[in-house]
Amino acid sequence: MSAEDTPEADADAAEESEPETARAKLFGEWDITDIEYSDPSTERYITVTPIAHTMGRHADKQFKKSEISIVERLINRLMQTDENTGKKQLATSIVTEAFELVHERTDENPIQVLVSAVENSAPREETVRLKYGGISVPKAVDVAPQRRVDQALKFLAEGVYGGSFKTTTTAAEALAQQLIGAANDDVQTYAVNQKEEKERVAAAAR
């Protein structure tokens, strides 16, 4: 074999390894390609990767959370209660089971359902309190895209907690209900209802 053949072999190996990376799936099951975004303003802040645990790599870096997978951010949100603090393996199993339920009930990629749920649960307006001469006055303001995603994840996690606390509904079932309802923009879903309420209050404060 001549020396000229060696670079071609390396190139072939590189071409073979590239599709392997592209075919990596979340939890070894869900395809992350072909995810569609309906809201251009939040698209760059909803990251989808096949990695669901980055071990706090960006914990001390401001705004770097947008580079973390939206699935991991949802898992982290589910840990933010007294009972679940630090229990990432439990939160991950809840999300994994919920994704299975979402796929069974909708026959869709649960990652796509999650992305749609976040977009539909993200408030566009909210209120801040301004003081004029010692009097607090509510003022409507636009919500930054990154905060919109943060608020959507918060509402989804709160909906799961409320839907599974002291009931026979499991956390995974509650999460599946929240994701499907929010993806369908159902106002009966807690996350969408909270978004509508925030926007209603902001509209009254214009």
From Swiss-Prot:
Listed GO MF terms: rRNA binding; structural constituent of ribosome
Positions of the UniProt region annotated as Disordered: 1-25
Annotated InterPro entries: Ribosomal_uS7, Ribosomal_uS7_arc, Ribosomal_uS7_CS, Ribosomal_uS7_dom, Ribosomal_uS7_dom_sf, Ribosomal_uS7_euk/arc
UniProt KW keywords: Acetylation, Ribonucleoprotein, Ribosomal protein, RNA-binding, rRNA-binding
Record-given protein name: Small ribosomal subunit protein uS7
GO CC terms in record: small ribosomal subunit
One Pfam family here: Ribosomal_S7
Oligomeric form and interacting partners: Part of the 30S ribosomal subunit.
Taxonomic path: Archaea, Methanobacteriati, Methanobacteriota, Stenosarchaea group, Halobacteria
Protein family per UniProt: Belongs to the universal ribosomal protein uS7 family.
Bias-annotated ranges (Acidic residues): 1-19
Gene name per UniProt: rps7
N-acetylserine: residues bearing it: S2
Domain of life: Archaea
A Gene Ontology BP annotation from the UniProt entry: translation
PROSITE patterns attached to this UniProt entry: RIBOSOMAL_S7 (PS00052)
Biological function: One of the primary rRNA binding proteins, it binds directly to 16S rRNA where it nucleates assembly of the head domain of the 30S subunit. Is located at the subunit interface close to the decoding center.
HAMAP family linked: Ribosomal_uS7_A
